[in-house]
Each structure stands twice: as C-alpha cells, then as structure tokens.
A protein has these predicted regions:
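Feature recognizes metal-dependent phosphohydrolase scaffolds
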Residues: 1-466
Length: 466
C-alpha cells in the first residue's frame, strides 16, 4: 500500500510531463515501441565525435580535415581492403572519397571507357559506406541520404552481394547505375555521404576567426553542416562584438586583420568598405615608413607587393592608435574593471621617446604620432571619429557577417558538456593554489561555471532585441 501511495504521488508530481509525452505517444503500443527503440540505440557503438580548435581562418586545412575525418576514413578503408588492395589503390580510393569531383575528372582524362572502373569502385564505396553507417540506426542513416539516390543507396547498404539470393539484384542495380549514365553523380553522392557519416558531431573549441584568409568560408560550410557546436574563443567574441557595432572590437578586429594582411575576410567575405580606412591612413601617415607595422606573412605566396604592404602598414598603425584611444576611454568609463594598467598612452614621454610599463621604462620603436594629443591622449580627432563611425556602419550592414554571428549564437556557448567531457576554449581564471579565481562581473562576484554562465548571459543580452 505505501508503494502505491508513493507511486501516485510521483505520478501527480510528473503529470505535466506525462501530458506532454502523451501528445506524441498517446497509446501503450507507441510508448513501448519508443522505449524499445531508445534502449536499443543506447547499445549501439557511440557515434564519432570530432574535435577541432583554433581554426584561425585556415579554410583549406579545415575543409581537408572534414573530408578525411582526420584520417578516420583512411583507417576504415585499410580495415576493409588492406589485404586486397595495394597501397596506391588505397590512396586512390581515399582521394576519391575526399575529393570525388576532382578525382573523377582526372580518371576521365586517362580512360575513356570507365565501365570497369565504375563497377569496381561502386562496390568498394558501398562497402565503405556500409561500414561507416553501421554505428547508426536505419532511420538516422535514411535522414542523411541524398534525396536523388536515397532509395538506391538504402537498398545497396542493406543488401549484400554475398547473399546468393540477392547477388543478381545488387548486380543489376550497379549495372543500371552505370548504364544510365548516372555513375559519376552516384559516386559523388555516396562519397559525400561517407564524409558525413564519418563525423556524427563536430565540436569546435573556439577561434574560427583570426589571421587566416577564410573565416567567412569556414562559416559558410558550418552554416550548412549537419551537426556542430562551438565554444566561443576570444577571436570569435571579438568578431561578434564588431558585428554588434562595438567600436573597440571593430578596431581590434581590423588591427589583427592588417597585422596578418588578412584582407579577404574583411573585403571579399563581409564587404567591409576599406576605402575610408585607406584614405585616412595614406593622408595621415603619408611620410611615415610605418616599418614596425608591416604585416606578418608566413606564406610567401600570400605576400602582397611592396606598395600594398606599405598601405596595409599605414592602416595598421592608424587603427592601432584608434584602438588604444578607444580602449583607454573604456577603462576610464569603467574603473571597476581595475584595468588602469592598460592605459598605456598616458605613460608615453614624447620628449624622451619612451613609455613606462609596470614601472619599467622602454624606448619606443616608433615616434611619429600625429593624431596623439599629449594633454589628452585618448581623445579621437574629428577625422578618427568620422572614420570609426563609418567603419561601424559597414560592420552593422554586412548581411553575411550578421548571418554568421547568428549561427555562432545558435550553435555556440562559453562551454559545452558532451558525453561527460567539459569543452571550453583556452583557459579558466584560477588562483596560484589551483582554486577558481573569483571575478567581479557587473557587481556580481563569480568564478568557474558561474563566471562562464554570466559571461554567456551578457553576450546573449547584447544581441537580444527585446
């Protein structure tokens, strides 16, 4: 009798949830079917999770890692064909899976009659696809199938040519794919399916943006990707702040872009108008070599000509001074941040050409500051004020940038917990003894998880139109 009372009490407490569940599962048979399904799924192998961090705009490397699943696809191919294919044949098959369109074009150049090639390759690809899909339910695989070939691929995945009763059936399907001229399209579709099934969930632990030229292309890929999340990095937050119109973030984003000569993301990616920036920099620093502001470029193939490098250096110096001024204004407005040690412009001795940082005097490597007023170093000139306002407008009206930031908000967070793994970017503030450091955030002292939650709350509030 007591058990019945407790049970009834629990049922009454959970009645709201039971009513909600009853909408989707109104009958006993539907409930039991769902229980059986979920319990069975729990006994499948754990789907493949993929972890990437610090992409920094390197889109080519990112795309290659997605295509080969960091070597996971090659490992599967070796498991299946290691004893039957030569090393070169394994490499060729893997290349086909990673880059099907390009590989097929090369094959067509070397061979006009591809019937035998397609016959062999299709059987190999079906075997690889069957292997990578084995972790998932049929329902999940079905949802991943390309609509154009969904029925055919599903039949081939679940019917084996080893079954004597189905040999003719499978053989005729493959022959007709080739005979109807659809082999190339089918190969590309199944290769892309293998890529997709090889990564069930993609975790990005911060910093899509920074020095590389293709952050916008990475975001385009992620916007169409089937399952991904991101734990925001410092560079991601900078771009999100810039998209929100924060002038300090805009100046910082531009300075870092000029530092690495990353103009593609700004101009080609997001359509940011650089003409006002270039005009201001050339006029203000016309007679300045700006040698300490020349861009850092590791890849010689990406290095612009000297004239362009000089212009980028001028823009780099111009926006750096604007950033230091805006940061100083921000620290003055928020003394509770205790960041007076970052107000460096006021430590400059213009006569001696030095600055003082943490009590140590350093000689300046550049002494030409035509826009700095020693009496009020953080005040923008009228021209600087006009420039930063125009740049702010460009960031606010960039539809592609705003769309990408919405994707970061939709899929992102300060930290994530997946399969008992704690994911976050870079570091968490800590004391010398290893305990979590308490930080004052708008009058609230928080640390660890509470700090992360509070920061994320502030980020989302900044984009909440309500």
């Amino acid at each position: 009798m007591p058990k019945t009372t407790i049970s009834n009490r629990n049922i009454n407490a959970d009645m709201r949830y039971l009513k909600l569940l009853a909408r989707d599962f109104p009958t006993i048979s539907q409930v039991t079917t769902e229980i059986i399904n979920l319990e069975a799924i729990l006994h499948l192998p754990k789907p493949t999770e993929h972890f990437l961090a610090d992409l920094h705009g390197e889109t080519e490397a990112f795309q290659h890692v997605l295509r080969n699943a960091s070597g996971n696809i090659k490992r599967k191919v070796k498991e299946l064909f290691g004893n039957t294919l030569r090393e070169k044949e394994i490499r060729d098959l893997c290349t086909l899976i990673y880059y099907p369109k390009q590989k097929l074009e090369l094959v067509k150049q070397n061979d006009t009659d591809l019937s035998d090639y397609y016959q062999t390759t299709l059987n190999q690809l079906i075997a690889v696809c069957r292997n990578v899909s084995s972790k998932y339910t049929r329902s999940k695989v079905r949802k991943s199938l390309p609509p154009e070939f969904a029925y055919i691929i599903e039949e081939l995945l679940h019917e084996s040519s080893d079954d004597r009763n189905k040999q003719a059936y499978v053989g005729v399907i493959i022959q007709n794919i080739i005979g109807t001229g659809r082999a190339a399209g089918f190969v590309m579709a199944i290769c892309e399916l293998i890529q997709r099934l090889s990564i069930d969930q993609l975790h990005i632990l911060g910093d899509i943006f920074d020095r590389g030229p293709g952050a916008h292309l990475i975001m385009d890929t992620l916007s169409k990707y089937h399952n991904w999340d991101i734990q925001w990095g410092n560079h991601d937050i900078l771009w999100m702040g810039a998209a929100a119109g924060n002038k300090v973030c805009i100046a910082s984003v531009l300075r870092l872009s000029f530092r690495y000569a990353n103009m593609q993301t700004l101009e080609e990616g997001y359509g940011i108008n650089m003409v006002p920036m270039a005009t201001f920099a050339m006029e203000t620093y016309a007679d300045d070599s700006c040698k300490v502001f020349f861009p850092k470029i590791e890849d010689p193939n990406r290095r612009p000509n000297e004239k362009t490098c000089k212009l980028i250096a001028q823009m780099h110096k111009a926006i750096a001074i604007i950033q230091f001024k805006l940061e100083g204004q921000l620290y003055q407005q928020h003394p509770e941040w205790n960041m007076d040690d970052r107000k460096l412009l006021e430590t400059i001795d213009f006569e001696k050409g030095t600055c003082c940082v943490d009590g140590t005097v350093y000689p300046l490597t550049d002494l030409n500051f035509p826009t700095l007023n020693p009496a009020n170093p953080y005040q923008l000139t009228a021209e600087e004020e006009d420039l930063i306002n125009r740049l702010q407008h460009s960031f606010l009206i960039s539809d592609r940038l705003q769309s990408h930031v919405q994707q970061l908000l939709l899929h992102g967070s300060m930290y994530g917990i997946y399969n008992s793994n704690l994911l976050f970017h870079a570091s968490v503030p800590m004391n010398q003894d290893g305990s979590l450091k308490k930080i004052d955030v708008e009058g609230q002292t928080v640390s660890g998880r509470e700090l992360m939650n509070r920061v994320e709350e502030l980020v989302r509030m900044a984009f909440d139109e309500d």
